[in-house]
């Protein structure tokens, strides 16, 4: 007999202290929380702790699919769970530093013991380590590596090892060395959301003296709560997510469409092998402010509408990207391999032409030219595309938009 849905009100500490591995499934989005999201979380916790309220603070509902033994598939709550772990690692480093510098006096003994208990608890969460194993890790930090608390297999996540690189670091400097850096980016812009958010938490914790730090950490672990809803049927878990997801980050067009493509792919491994390079190439072009994955979907929509001569129907309103793929032309998603080849073609065109002087000029001059240019160049055979063949259409677009401006 199938297990029933199991809802539980849990503190953050109890929720994260699991023997099973948290898992972000293939169809989920990439880690998208930014500094603004983390600042909001921090302010909520800080304000709640300052009020010294008796009632717990509620961080919403987290939905978990338990259909695979040993894993907790995060259907709703991946962004919060990842962020909680980044905050815990920042707390781990800061408490370690504070304990190292605290005077060994009778007056400080109680506070020191309380901070050590919090550190022990965080060790149990991040490294599945009891006190004995914690001592072994502190003697040889290599023992902390390879302990898996969260597995990310999302087809949309390019930086799957970032969380582990941060958690496995002994110091902040070690974490900074281990994480990915975007080339040609300066200051915090060179880091992923994972490290930027972790760094922000770590810096905020430096404003706290020993006693205030103890109160903050204890409050976060033992007074802040979530409702964990476990389901042993994935379809049931996703249905609950669709019903309850009113406070999470809105899903992007690419989030929705990639999930549908994944569900329709005849072979999941083959699809991942095709989709992940698309996401990586789109991310590289987005870093250069050329095009992102949502723009790729939009551009193919315009290309396909023009190819189908939809402008002849008299319907002049342009549909939203999501509606076009899921309602108006859902059959486009029935062949994931074919449509991914179209997306890949668009990305290859932009990768090739981004270096052309006229492209650089148009990118600075007017964003709207992209839809016109890609619709034209998509028709050009790949072997015939060159700066010479692209120049006439780009010069024409430059004149047109100069007049419109």
Model-derived features: positions:
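Glycine- and hydrophobic-rich flexible loops that cap the catalytic core of alpha/beta enzyme folds
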Residues: 2-307
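A cross-family structural signal marking well-folded subdomains
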Residues: 208, 225, 246, 252-405
């Amino acid at each position: 007999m199938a297990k029933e849905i199991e809802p539980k009100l849990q503190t953050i500490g109890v929720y994260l202290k699991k023997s099973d591995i948290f898992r972000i499934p293939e169809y989920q989005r990439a880690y998208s929380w930014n500094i603004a999201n983390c600042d909001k979380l921090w302010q909520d916790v800080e304000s709640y702790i300052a009020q010294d309220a008796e009632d717990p603070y509620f961080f919403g509902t987290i939905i978990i699919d338990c259909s695979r033994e040993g894993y907790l598939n995060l259907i709703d709550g991946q962004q919060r769970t990842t962020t909680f772990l980044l905050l815990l690692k920042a707390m781990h480093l800061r408490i370690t530093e504070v304990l190292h510098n605290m005077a060994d006096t009778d007056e400080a003994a109680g506070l020191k013991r309380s901070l050590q208990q919090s550190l022990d608890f965080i060790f149990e969460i991040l490294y599945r380590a009891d006190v004995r194993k914690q001592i072994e890790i502190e003697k040889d930090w290599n023992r902390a590596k390879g302990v898996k608390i969260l597995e990310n297999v999302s087809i949309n996540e390019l930086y799957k090892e970032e969380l582990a690189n941060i958690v496995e670091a002994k110091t902040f400097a070690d974490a900074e060395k281990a994480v990915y850096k975007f080339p040609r980016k300066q200051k915090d812009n060179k880091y992923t959301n994972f490290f930027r958010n972790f760094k922000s938490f770590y810096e905020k914790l430096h404003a706290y003296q020993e006693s205030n730090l103890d109160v903050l950490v204890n409050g976060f672990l033992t007074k802040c709560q979530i409702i964990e809803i476990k389901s042993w049927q994935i379809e049931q878990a996703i249905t609950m997510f669709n019903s309850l997801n009113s406070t999470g980050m809105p899903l992007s067009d690419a989030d929705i469409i990639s999930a549908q493509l994944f569900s329709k792919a005849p072979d999941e491994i083959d699809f991942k092998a095709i989709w992940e390079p698309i996401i990586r190439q789109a991310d590289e072009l987005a870093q250069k402010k050329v095009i992102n994955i949502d723009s790729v979907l939009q551009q193919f929509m315009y290309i396909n509408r023009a190819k189908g001569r939809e402008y002849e129907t008299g319907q002049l309103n342009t549909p939203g990207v999501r509606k076009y793929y899921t309602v108006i032309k859902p059959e486009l998603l029935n062949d994931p391999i074919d449509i991914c080849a179209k997306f890949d073609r668009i990305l290859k065109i932009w990768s090739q032409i981004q270096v052309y002087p006229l492209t650089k000029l148009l990118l600075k001059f007017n964003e709207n030219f992209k839809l016109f240019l890609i619709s034209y160049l998509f028709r050009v055979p790949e072997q015939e595309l060159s700066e010479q063949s692209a120049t006439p259409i780009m010069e024409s677009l430059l004149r047109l938009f100069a007049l419109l401006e």
